[in-house]
Regions:
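A cross-kingdom marker for long, charged
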Residues: 229-232, 236, 244, 249-281
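Membrane-embedded segments
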Residues: 90, 99, 105, 109-117
Length: 287
């Protein structure tokens, strides 16, 4: 009896120690996924429109299936999606960032972002940044013209998306999204700095008011239309209080505790002919 009791004690002790070791390993694994260092790599992916019809897909339009496969790949490979607030919280010491973090962005605010992307973000517990052209959303809010093909999100759509916790709304200008008289928010040829400052400020502030009124949250990031900017543009955007800017330049980003690391972030356009795996390999090769 005594020997049996001893055996039981040995077995119990072994099981207990195994459990302790397992918990320690699991806890360590969780800790390893959080970056407590002074810098974090951040690839930013740029999407625009999501449509099922292959005939309508192009350099800026991919299928909802491709987007879902992207989310699956990211989840299966340990990536965590972040938004601008996560970055600013990290910079100012309010939180850590995941070691393998990535930002997904949608430009222009197409209605199909609401129709296709939002349910998929909810399904895979992912977040994204959507930057609508405020004047276009204003128009579709007034006309109530709903179309997955050509429509844009309304202010009510923005509110719902923002409240979901899966989408962050940022500023993409009110109506400076053209290649005609000027390229995006760039100055016109021969335009004085004073005139340019007045026009840019009026446009961006108007967009800020509409977006904040719609969501109850003030945008903190300016997303350059076409990625077009110059030194004066960046200076004026900073003076308006934006803590982050996004470009269309394909380059890797290193986020540090320095607030300046959030300006002029590079983004990689999501090409439908490239796998997410290859895209991320490209970002690593450029790091």
């Amino acid at each position: 009896m005594k020997s049996n009791k001893t055996v039981k004690i040995i077995i119990f002790t072994a099981l207990f120690l195994s459990a302790v070791i397992l918990i320690s390993v699991m806890t360590g694994a969780v800790k390893e996924t959080t970056a407590d260092t002074d810098s974090v790599k951040l690839p930013v992916i740029m999407y625009h429109s999501l449509l099922k019809d292959e005939k309508l897909q192009n350099d800026y339009t991919v299928s909802p299936t491709l987007f879902e496969n992207d989310l699956k790949y990211l989840a299966e490979n340990g990536y965590t999606t972040v938004v601008v607030k996560d970055l600013t919280d990290y910079v100012y010491g309010k939180k850590s960032l995941p070691e393998k973090c990535i930002m997904l962005t949608f430009d222009d605010g197409y209605y199909n972002n609401y129709y296709y992307a939002l349910p998929l973000l909810e399904k895979y517990n992912c977040k994204a940044v959507i930057s609508p052209i405020a004047s276009v959303s204003e128009k579709f809010t007034e006309t109530k013209d709903i179309s997955v093909t050509y429509g844009h999100i309304t202010f009510d759509d923005m509110k719902e998306m923002s409240d979901s916790g899966y989408v962050e709304i940022q500023n993409h200008s009110y109506d400076m999204h053209s290649l005609k008289s000027r390229k995006g928010v760039l100055p016109k040829a021969g335009e004085s700095d004073e005139a340019y400052k007045s026009i840019l400020t009026e446009d961006v502030v108007k967009a800020q008011g509409l977006l904040e009124n719609a969501t109850g949250k003030k945008p903190t990031c300016f997303v350059y239309p076409f990625g077009a900017k110059n030194d004066l543009t960046e200076k004026l955007i900073k003076e308006m209080g934006f803590s982050c800017t996004l470009t269309c330049t394909e380059k890797p980003n290193i986020i540090t505790k320095n607030p300046d690391s959030l300006y002029e972030l590079g983004r990689y356009r999501r090409d439908r002919n490239e796998s997410m795996q290859n895209l991320l390999i490209r970002t690593e090769m450029q790091s």
